[in-house]
Amino acid sequence: HHGPLLTYLTFNLELYGTWDLILAASLIALLWGYYFTRFKLFVPKDYLLYFIVFILSCLITPFCIVLYDILHFSFQFYGDGGFLDHVMYYIFGVGGIEELTKALPVLICVLVFSKRMKEPVDYLILATVSALGFAFMENLMYFDQYYGNSNFDVIHNRSVLSVIMHIFCSTIIWYGFIKTRMLKKIKYLVGCIVLSIVTHGMYDVFLTQSVSSVFYVFSFGMVVFSFFGLKMMYNSALNQSPFFNPNNVYPANENAFILIASLGMVLIFEFILDAIRFGAPHANDSLLTSLLA
């Protein structure tokens, strides 16, 4: 037993963010947020709504820890048995808990601000931004754990791989929601929720099994697949917009350039942090490994 709930919560939900880590995590959230909000082609972007869902997500995310504790202490479920036990833990434990946590801020916004939901793509953008809020908080926890390790590789590793998986798994649920609302068949929503949780769980399984590089290739492959899957879902949602206008074309080349430039910025930022902490020669080596990664 954890003693009084309040002590437990304050102890567990404490995050130590130093300026550079908060900046790194914010940079990542901003770069992906900017990239995905550019899919709003027909109706002006609703920045206030995006901000609200982001903040809600940041506030709700730390409570994941409470759910994990219930899983561990009340159900004695740690996933430390064999491979199958591991898979079950990551799908039902991790995938289930984290997808529920990311869907909640979107659900709140959809219910409270239903008037502001103008077209199908709005649901996807909210899901994406909620995932970014989740990843932002999670990145603070991870960067904090790895802080002062030999270098800041963890920043760009998490900025690309984990964030895309979080966005994909969140967005697919709301893509299922759009489909279900349009075709009046619940199977789309149910199917997408299952797909989201299983994908999330399996990605984590591959990542934690990454002693062998084979699994790492799997998880990397999942990220690439997810990135293209996201573009497909966004395109499909745009085609269903009541405000569809064939003259507003998605600026694919420009967006690809923006994405590459922003990821470059993350690398440069990592380089600066490295140089400040460990000196330039070390930073040069790290940058080289990062570029090859």
Placement of each model-derived feature along the sequence:
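Hydrophobic alpha-helical segments at protein termini of multi-pass membrane proteins
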Residues: 1-293
